[in-house]
Amino acid sequence: MYGPSPDTRHPMEGFDQVCFIKNVVHNPNIVVGDYSYYDDPVDSENFERNVLYHYPFMNDKLIIGKFCAIARDVKFVMNGANHKISGITAYPFSIFGNGWEGATPELGDLPYKGDTVIGNDVWIGYDSLIMPGVKRSEERR
């Protein structure tokens, strides 16, 4: 078969702004298929900086299929960004400590949208914002 190896970091020789994402992520809760790439002229290997509020205790996953094209400055907002809105306040008192720890909601009381899943062959354009729990299926033409 022709084409670059899916295990290559930078599939275009001399053009480091494009990288195959699966070869640069270290978070086990980010799963990326072969040939999906991220294009960023500043630091293409630091894809994980675009996955926001992805706390281990939330146990949510970002799953990206094969052959996806992800442009510069795309952000994935994960479930850790959600605030409890069913009580008196949505303010996260507990994260500031100093006696406010008792206001910590149970994990099950926080809004949870599930894993964020991007199917195969999906293009995500420049500066897009993908919210928690979004499921985007394969690209259709």
Write out the residue ranges for each language-model feature.
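Generic detector of short, locally flexible boundary/turn motifs and exposed helical patches
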Residues: 1-4, 34, 88-89
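A composition-driven signal for long, intrinsically disordered, charge-rich low-complexity tracts
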Residues: 18-20, 33-38
